[in-house]
From Swiss-Prot:
This is NCT transcriptional regulatory complex subunit A. GO terms for molecular function: core promoter sequence-specific DNA binding; protein heterodimerization activity; RNA polymerase II general transcription initiation factor activity. Its main location: nucleus. Belongs to the NC2 alpha/DRAP1 family. The keyword Ribonucleoprotein does not apply. Residues 1-31, 48-82, 212-247 are annotated as: Disordered. Forms the NCT transcriptional regulatory complex with nctB and mot1. One of its GO terms (cellular component) is negative cofactor 2 complex. GO terms for biological process: transcription by RNA polymerase II. It comes from Aspergillus fumigatus (strain ATCC MYA-4609 / CBS 101355 / FGSC A1100 / Af293) (Neosartorya fumigata). Residues 13-22 have a biased composition (Polar residues).
Amino acid sequence: MTDQDSTYRPRSPDLSTFQSSIPPAVNSPIYPLASPLAHRASYDASPFFAPQYQQPPAPLGRVPQQYIPPFVDPNSPLSPDMARRSSRLARATEVAPMPEVSYAQPVLSEEPQQLPPPPPQPNPVASIEVKTKFPVARIKRIMQADEDVGKVAQVTPIAVSKALELFMISLVTKAAKEARDRNSKRVTATHLKQAVVKDEVLDFLADIIAKVPDQPAGGRKHDDDGSDQNEQPKRKRGGRRPKDDSD
């Protein structure tokens, strides 16, 4: 290879004969190509330094103005009309008041408290023991003597004896209450009569108690003393006759 090929470098093209058909945007001075300012003059920096297009600001919108009613002299003749008009406008724009909501407290139905049942009262008849029983054999003979009864079962006289016993206890207990109310220490026929009269269950004894005389006025004194009305006075025992003095 030759020295020219070994030291090869590209040659700059010759632009002296090239003429641009587009006129330059900015009139710049023409420098000869041999001048050192020729390369700098060919650089067009007008696009970078040209002022950019700025959009004109939009016109400001019209600010709404609040309507202020003109001042009206209260002494002028137009003031009543204006007042009525203002009152109508005020009533039209007035918001109806909301109805008051009242909270109704729920009523709780209170259940009545159930009282405990009272303890069963002991039966006074059950606590009384009768030592002398009604004779069952005699009750049986009395029942068999009745023509309407005829034969009697073995258990029947026993049940009748127990029923008579309970009836006697009930009647005597009521008569004893009458005696206590009258401050008497004994139960008499008069007390039995008062007990039968006050109890409707014992009305079947009305014919029997009708034969019992009412208690006399002085009977209360005998009851208080604990004496019996039917009790007869005791006879005094006679003593020995005094011996006559013999002469």
